Amino acid sequence: MKIAFCLFKYSPYSGLSLDFGRILEECLNRGHSAHVFVSEWQGEHPEGAQFTVLESPKISLKFSNHAQNEQFHNKLQVELKKQAFDVVVGFNKMPGLDLYYGADSCYVGDKVPQYPAIYKLTRRYKGRYSFEEAVFGVKSQTLILSLSERQKSEYQEYY
C-alpha cells in the first residue's frame, strides 16, 4: 500500500509523535510505501519514507495555530492530488482523512465549555470545530482509531 501520513508537527518528545513513529516503522517493516507530510519536523527522519515539509510563511498575518493548521491543510490537499495514495492517515483532526489516529481530546466537549458563548463566533473556534467535525461528524467517512473507551464516548456524545 502507498500510505500518506499527515501530522502538523513532529517532535521526538511528543507522545503523539512517538506513536506516529512506531506506526510508520511498522508499516515500513511490512513493506508498505510511506510519504510523510508535516508543517514542522524536529529530529532525524526515519529511513525508508519520503518526507515533505509544508512550511507556513515565517512572516504572516496568519500566525496563530489554527490559521497555520488551515494553511497546512490547504497545501496538503494540493500535494495529495499530485499522487495516488491508497490511504491518507492523519494524526491531527482535519478534513479529507481516510483514517484518524485519535490521540486528542474532543475540542467541543473538552475545550469549548471553558470559554464564554461568544467564543463560538471566533475564527479559532470555527476552524477547529470544522476540522473536528470533518472527522467525527455524521457525514464523515473517516475511520477512527480511538485510544480509550472514555475518549470514544466523549466524541459520541457530541457527534
Residue ranges and their predicted role:
Residues 90-94, 102-104:
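Short His-centered aromatic/hydrophobic patch
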